[in-house]
């Protein structure tokens, strides 16, 4: 089966590195893209990315596959998964939302985010209005994102995290 892994906020394709060998060993064909302005894809660096720009490369990827794919999305990647399911329903076998946003029609992440009063991300997120990006300060990343990770994985992630384009969430 084709599986497309969609990373969440501030991350890139790199965040799946521990999962990939297990899925390949199970015989799956994996597609692990960096979303625009994430990971190694720095074509857009100022955050002016809407949902269309974020989903377009994945639509092209789905269009090239010979069979429907499973989508596995983490965190804010759930927004992308839902949009793909609407745009290419015949190309998607199933969607797995792994601690991901699955919003109601018309709901925005910002709306959902305001309701989640206990969220550590909500408490610590820093929004850079000039670049339309958001990020988390390094001193709260372990507590907020990596509480169950070993120190080596935390350091790896810290070295690879990037600012998140905020526009798709607004």
Set out the residue ranges of the language-model regions:
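Gly/Ala-rich beta-loop-alpha elbow adjacent to hydrolase catalytic centers
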Residues: 72-77, 81
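Alpha/beta-hydrolase
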Residues: 115-116, 122-170
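Flexible "cap/lid" loop of the alpha/beta hydrolase fold
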Residues: 86, 91-129, 165-169
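Conserved HGGG/HGGXW glycine-rich cap/lid loop of the alpha/beta-hydrolase fold
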Residues: 2-42, 66-69
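Glycine-rich His-Gly loop
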Residues: 6-9, 74-75, 100
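Active-site loop/oxyanion-hole signature of alpha/beta-hydrolase fold enzymes
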Residues: 29-31, 35-70, 86-87, 110-114
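Active-site signature of alpha/beta-hydrolase-fold catalytic machinery across serine-
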Residues: 18, 83-87
């Amino acid at each position: 089966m084709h599986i497309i892994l969609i990373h969440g906020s501030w991350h890139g394709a790199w965040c799946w590195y521990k999962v990939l060998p297990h899925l390949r060993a199970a015989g799956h064909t994996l597609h692990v893209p960096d979303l625009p302005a994430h990971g190694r894809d720095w074509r857009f660096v100022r955050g002016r990315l809407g949902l269309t720009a974020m989903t377009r490369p994945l639509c092209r990827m789905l269009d090239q596959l010979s069979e429907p794919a499973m989508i596995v999305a983490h965190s804010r990647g759930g927004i992308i998964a839902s949009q793909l399911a609407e745009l290419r329903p015949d190309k998607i076998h199933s969607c797995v939302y792994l601690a991901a946003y699955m919003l109601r029609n018309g709901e925005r992440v910002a709306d959902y985010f305001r309701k989640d009063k206990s969220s550590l991300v909500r408490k610590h997120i820093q929004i850079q209005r000039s670049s339309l990006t958001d990020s988390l300060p390094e001193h709260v990343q372990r507590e907020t994102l990596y509480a169950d990770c070993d120190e080596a994985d935390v350091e790896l992630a810290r070295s690879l995290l990037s600012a998140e384009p905020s526009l798709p969430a607004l």
